[in-house]
Amino acid sequence: MHEFSLCQSVISIAKKAAENNSKKVSKIVVKIGNLAGVDIESFEFWFPVAAKDSVLEQAKLEIIHEQAIAKCKACEHEFELTRLYEQCPNCGSFEKDILKGKDMLVESIVFN
């Protein structure tokens, strides 16, 4: 059910943009990192439910999957993450900065 509230947030952003353009939304692109904690299948399921009777009701949802990338604090090696508590494959350290892949954001909105 967490994904439904995320859909509502995305729709709220698009509604505000649509009000400024006085148009309906034909497509919305959302980038979701693999560490964002979003179940993409659930998000895709809930999107049309949340968009019903809004300027996004007919909008196509496009999701861009973003692979998480981290940089090791010990050896500065950059590597892909599939889960949060992964150690550096170069030196074995667990200390890292996550460079990308932990966020969810509206990448673009296309109006009719």
UniProtKB/Swiss-Prot annotation:
Zn(2+) binds at C72, C75, C88, C91. It comes from Francisella philomiragia subsp. philomiragia (strain ATCC 25017 / CCUG 19701 / FSC 153 / O#319-036). It comes from the Bacteria. Signal peptide: none annotated. GO terms for molecular function: nickel cation binding; zinc ion binding. Belongs to the HypA/HybF family. One of its GO terms (biological process) is protein modification process. The gene is hypA. The keyword NAD does not apply. Involved in the maturation of [NiFe] hydrogenases. Required for nickel insertion into the metal center of the hydrogenase. This is Hydrogenase maturation factor HypA. Disulfide bonds: none annotated. InterPro entries: HypA/HybF.
